[in-house]
A protein has these predicted regions:
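Single conserved hydrophobic/aromatic residue that forms the stacking wall/gate
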Residues: 1-6, 10
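Hydrophobic face of alpha-helices
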Residues: 3, 21-24, 136, 177
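Hydrophobic transmembrane alpha-helical segments of multi-pass transport and channel proteins
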Residues: 11-23
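Long, charged amphipathic helices and adjacent flexible linkers at domain junctions
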Residues: 28-59, 194-195
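Structured cytosolic domains appended to multi-pass membrane proteins
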Residues: 48-193
Length: 195
């Protein structure tokens, strides 16, 4: 009985395999086409960025760190173009009148749409230090005079990003420690209560 039951299972599997593989092929073909269409659509959409924008800040990533920086730059009236992978964030920025490009900054076409060649600053706030390093190297080759500031989480990322051409690399933990040391050097005016 058991062997007969297993035989039925194997027969069904053999019969279903061609169907499943055909469906998988169709899905993968649609996925590849969708990715190509997405890039083409993104390029078409980004044609709205004024061609004459130059000497601007190019901010890669508008998450927790990027949004804080972006708001300060906007408040200071510094011309800004944001590159962001989140469609929702890009739509929100555009609704506010902020120039935003949907895509990955590692893609040269996306950087062209954001006018890397004449940007004054490139600010990378993305959390992946190695991806940031590759973006830095590519940007430095295309715009040797650009000021590049990047974010890192680890010492090896700082080295990697710096070697690829960043002018400055900020590591969160170091900045927290530096600020705490500064606070120790200038204690508060009031009485300090300890446990």
């Amino acid at each position: 009985r058991v062997s007969r039951g297993l035989g039925d299972v194997y027969k069904r599997q053999i019969m279903l395999n061609p169907v499943l593989f055909a469906l998988l092929e169709k899905y993968l073909a649609k996925t590849e086409t969708l990715e190509e269409q997405t890039l083409e659509e993104a390029i078409e959409e980004e044609k709205q960025i004024p061609v004459d924008i130059c000497n601007h800040a190019l901010l890669v990533g508008y998450g927790r760190v990027g949004s804080l920086l972006g708001e300060k730059l906007l408040a200071s009236d510094i011309p800004l173009v944001v590159i962001e992978t989140s469609r929702t964030r890009v739509d929100e920025l555009r609704e506010r009148g902020v120039r935003a490009v949907l895509g990955n900054a590692a893609n040269e076409e996306i950087m062209q749409l954001a006018h890397l060649e004449c940007a004054k600053w490139l600010i990378l706030t993305i959390p992946n230090g190695y991806e940031a390093g590759e973006i830095v190297a590519s940007a430095r080759a295309k715009n040797p005079d650009i000021e590049i500031i990047a974010r890192a989480h680890y010492d090896d990322e700082v080295t990697y990003i710096t070697e690829r051409g960043a002018n400055q690399v900020v590591m969160g933990e170091r900045e927290i420690a530096r600020t705490m040391l500064e606070l120790l050097e200038t204690p508060p005016a009031g009485e300090v209560v300890t446990g």
